[in-house]
Structure formats: C-alpha cells, structure tokens
Curated annotation (Swiss-Prot):
The gene is ccrM. One of its GO terms (molecular function) is DNA binding. It catalyses: a 2'-deoxyadenosine in DNA + S-adenosyl-L-methionine = an N(6)-methyl-2'-deoxyadenosine in DNA + S-adenosyl-L-homocysteine + H(+). This is DNA methyltransferase CcrM. InterPro entries: DNA_methylase_N4/N6, DNA_methylase_N6_adenine_CS, RAMA, RM_Methyltransferase, SAM-dependent_MTases_sf. One of its GO terms (cellular component) is cytoplasm. Its EC number is 2.1.1.72. One of its GO terms (biological process) is methylation. Gene3D superfamilies: Vaccinia Virus protein VP39. Keywords: DNA replication, DNA-binding, Methyltransferase, S-adenosyl-L-methionine, Transferase. CcrM-mediated methylation has important cellular functions. Contributes to the accurate cell-cycle control of DNA replication and cellular morphology. The lineage of its organism: Bacteria, Pseudomonadati, Pseudomonadota, Alphaproteobacteria, Hyphomicrobiales. It comes from the Bacteria. Residues 271-373 form the RAMA domain.
Amino acid sequence: MSLVRLAHELPIEAPRTAWLDSIIKGDCVSALERLPDHSVDVIFADPPYNLQLGGDLHRPDQSMVSAVDDHWDQFESFQAYDAFTRAWLLACRRVLKPNGTIWVIGSYHNIFRVGTQLQDLGFWLLNDIVWRKTNPMPNFRGRRFQNAHETLIWASRDQKGKGYTFNYEAMKAANDDVQMRSDWLFPICTGSERLKDENGDKVHPTQKPEALLARIMMASSKPGDVILDPFFGSGTTGAVAKRLGRHFVGIEREQPYIDAATARINAVEPLGKAELTVMTGKRAEPRVAFTSVMEAGLLRPGTVLCDERRRFAAIVRADGTLTANGEAGSIHRIGARVQGFDACNGWTFWHFEENGVLKPIDALRKIIREQMAAAGA
C-alpha cells in the first residue's frame, strides 16, 4: 500500500485524512506547513547530528568505519545548524497540541545546541534520558572515552502544558514495580531488525532500535494518538506506531529511505486491543466529588455508613458531608476523626449496606466514572 504524499501537493493545513498514517515527501519545514495547528500528540525527532567529521575513520585493521557522512548531515557552520534547528522546532511547536510533548534525540555534537533552542522557543523540559548502548562502537583512535550513549530530551509544549500523557504506572509495572529511571539500556540496531539493501549495506546509517521507540510511545502516548516524526528515515517510528495502535505521520525527503520505510510499515501487523491496554494509576482517573454519588441517586441523605468491621458509623447529610460524634466534614475528614488519625481515604474506609452485604462507597465512585467515560468526559 502506498503511504507517500508529496508535500507540495498537500494544501496548507490539509485535512487529517490527507496526511494521517502517511509519509510526506519533502523538506521537513515546508512539509510541516501542510499540517493544521495543534494536530499531533507526540513528536519524536531524530535530526541531523552535524557530526563535523574531518575525514575517514579506520579500524586498527585499516578497514573503514561506516560513519554518517551523508549530505544531509553537513552544515556550513554552527550558526547554520542553529538556524535550521530553530526553524523545524518552531514548525513542530505549531502543530503540537497544547498538552503534547516532544522527544529529541542527539549526541554530544548537537544535543546541547538543540536543548538551548527548545528552551528559547518556550518548550518546557521534563526529562533528559540517557540511552546507554550495550554494544557501542569502540573509539578506534584511543584519544577519547568510548562514546557509549545518546541523549533524549523530553519536553512539553510550554510550561503550562499540564495535561501531557505520562503512563507512570505502566512504566513502573514494566520495571518490576520500581520507578522507571532516566537511564535506559538498549543495544544499537543490529541483526534482522537492521534494514539492508540488495548489496547487504545498511539502508540508513542511524536507524534507531524499535525497543527505544516502543518505550517512548508506551510512556508518553495512548492508543489512537498521532505521532509525528519530521526526520522519518527508515521508518522506525511508523513501524512501532502501527504495531502499538498509534497513528503516525512521517516527513522524509530521500526516496530510498521512503521506499524502505513503506515496505517496512506495510509488513507490520498491529497488536490487538487487549494487548494495547495501558495500565493507569488513580492519578489518571477523573476526579469524582462525593456529591456526584448523591446527585446520581446512588446514596441518599440519612444513609448510615460504617467501616468494614462496623466499629464506626456516620450519617450522610444533604450537603454531601458526613456527621459523626457531633462533628461534620468530608468523607475523608470524618473517617480520620473517628479513628483518631491525621488522614484517611474515605472512599475505601466508609461502606454502605446493600442486600445485607457491606460495600465500599468507592464502588459507587466507579459507577460515576464509568458514566463519565461513556459520556466522553
């Protein structure tokens, strides 16, 4: 299936159906002009690193190292690179949703310059992630430390972007119930995952491992979100997005990379809905006021609540407070007071009786949340 759209053939701020799940061929800045404002949820950018290589690099056996010496990684000066970086970041910021986030990966050659531009343009830095490579290239000349990592910057669109997605509980669960740290250990792309041409040569010199992109998407997006990659290359972002039930839009100007990415993405089988469910914590759930339970008719004023052992009791009042022992307050405050504690989760402490069985009032809160979800709230 053809995924390719020509940038110059797309209208300015083209409708979603014209660019979703496609590769736009063209320069990244001009192609981004075709996308509407606030149209993407997450951006992953792997821009040219501006490696400033001064010549060929050889191994001790005099074989030449395959390095990035392509024309797209060459700039006249740092000033030219900075101007390029500012242009594509500005274009990305326009299409990023107010609650969206951007990931930029780079090496020591460029990541600090990119970070400065991000802050100057109003992005708000959330984390820097160190990708530690299990199998990095040696330093053949022995004049520097072995360069064994790359750096990712994760940023929200601005300081006010409070509603961005971070699947904290899922990341923690995937890390043996320990908080996910900001240093990630992955091998560089090798073996069957590395795309090769008919001569057995690498299709792209800086192909990123799918595991890296999968972690980024699982951490900062939801199924159905739109992931933009303005430097699409061999299509790792598109392949992972399709497999994980996300939409993608890639921008690439080099036809050989577009051809390889198209074939790669067409071969991907998406995961099923059950496999894509993201584990969420209570912080991700919508807030429910106790009065909402009463307004829905699930509890009535005058209802007597108690703890699961029936040691303490409180009466529900019409204003949504509880009263016990001459005091009135929230479900949390009264739960704490009757126990002599400083704090209490009233939703799990207080129970109501239904058909002779005690149930936590949290069960009623879940009903309200289900109703909110059905209403799209």
